[in-house]
């Protein structure tokens, strides 16, 4: 079981966040609306989520290249994005290599209905707890800031599901902290996550579910 911590998101642009201001504004009512993952979360007010979820090549193009080179993906590699949203990353995978076979699932009906035209036929409504594909279906399975939106037992199940459908590589990013200050910021910043913990606890959780892929963290900073 290789299981390694690696930042494959180092090419993803980091937005400037005023954590303290946001923490003071977010209320439980905002979290309740955000966790429905409907229009308000993607394209509503910033307090409910993205505040406008639109495609821009600067977000995923370099990260897609990073994935492709790191995992040495072949010309006909199959890639699954769990929590694909409107399919932006899948679009950039196909821009990088038109022979890649891509697929995406998202719990949000709104996101799937508003997916980019270029990938609409490759995405579907789906749950990370019950990934609608056969065992060993994909060369690379990616889940970025998604499985932590599940309760703990469901989160464990989603990790097992990722392991099941991946025949070679997988990469997961989850909300986490390394110290008390980061924990305080995360608890205030978080809108949708239901499972979040110290990085060491995540590592133990991955091992307990026999996860053999790679992982990294979203740290509120």
Pin down the residues of each PLM region:
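Short catalytic micro-motifs in class I SAM-dependent methyltransferases
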Residues: 145-149
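Short, conserved loop/helix-junction motifs that constitute active-site signature segments
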Residues: 164-165
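A conserved beta-strand element that flanks and buttresses the S-adenosyl-L-methionine
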Residues: 142
